Amino acid sequence: NPCCDAATCKLKSGSQCGHGDCCEQCKFSKSGTECRASMSECDPAEHCTGQSSECPADVFHKNGQPCLDNYGYCYNGNCPIMYHQCYDLFGADVYEAEDSCFERNQKGNYYGYCRKENGNKIPCAPEDVKCGRLYSKDNSPGQNNPCKMLCSNEDEHKGRFLEQTGRGKVCSNRQ
């Protein structure tokens, strides 16, 4: 390391730092230099302070802050909305399904439920149907499935947390 004296394991005279995201040529990076890029609208970029070689802690916007033109709300640095979850699970040309698909979540069976309690599938209340199993519409050529779902015994593929489900309502804890 050109900033350190190998014999003493200390910084050389005139060096402020030897490593770090905010260390350039043995000096602290200028204040305002980006050291961690934004990962989403809810995760702002971090910038060097000019007083340290380390990038400040990764911080997110407060959970519940509106994002994506008020379509969703920030949650742990992301703006979770159903379109993104459909895309993540099924790929391009797949979108949130029609409301009628989500009504299946009132049945409390493998094909539709809100949550599990002691192994039992609990149906969604009518106002919570978009907080249960996720349904997507596949617009790919040759596909004709308006209510596509991931067939899995796992309980993770649910409507995303903190998405607006109408008139200021959001999903939280699958309700």
Swiss-Prot record:
List the PROSITE patterns hit by this protein, alphabetically. Answer: DISINTEGRIN_1, DISINTEGRIN_2
**What does UniProt note about where in the body, tissue by tissue, this protein is expressed?**
Expressed by the venom gland.
SUPFAM superfamilies the UniProt entry points to: Blood coagulation inhibitor (disintegrin)
Q: Name one GO cellular component term.
A: plasma membrane
Q: What class of enzyme is it?
A: hydrolase
What does the Swiss-Prot or TrEMBL cofactor note state? Answer: Binds 1 zinc ion per subunit.
Where located? Secreted
In chain numbering, motif D/ECD-tripeptide lies across 41-43
Show where the Disintegrin domain sits.
1-63
Q: Which GO terms describe its biological process?
A: proteolysis
The alphabetized UniProt keywords are: Calcium, Disulfide bond, Glycoprotein, Hemostasis impairing toxin, Hydrolase, Metal-binding, Metalloprotease, Protease, Secreted, Toxin, Zinc
Q: Which cysteines are joined by disulfide bonds?
A: C3-C26, C17-C23, C22-C48, C35-C55, C42-C74, C67-C79, C101-C147, C114-C124, C131-C171
Give the protein's cofactors. Answer: Zn(2+)
What kind of modification does the protein receive after translation? Glycosylated.
Which residues hold Ca(2+)?
D43, P44, E46, D58, V59
Q: Which residues form a coiled coil?
A: none
Q: Which domain of life is it from?
A: Eukaryota
**EC number(s) stated in the UniProt entry for this protein:** 3.4.24.-
Question: Which GO terms fall under molecular function for this chain's record?
Answer: metal ion binding; metallopeptidase activity; toxin activity
InterPro entries annotated for this entry?
A: ADAM_Cys-rich, Disintegrin_CS, Disintegrin_dom, Disintegrin_dom_sf
Give the UniProt family note. Answer: Belongs to the venom metalloproteinase (M12B) family. P-III subfamily. P-IIIa sub-subfamily.
Q: How does it assemble?
A: Monomer.
Q: What does this protein do?
A: Snake venom metalloproteinase that impairs hemostasis in the envenomed animal.
Q: What is this protein called?
A: Zinc metalloproteinase-disintegrin-like catroriarin
Origin species: Crotalus atrox (Western diamondback rattlesnake)
Q: What lineage does UniProt assign to this protein's organism?
A: Eukaryota, Metazoa, Chordata, Craniata, Vertebrata
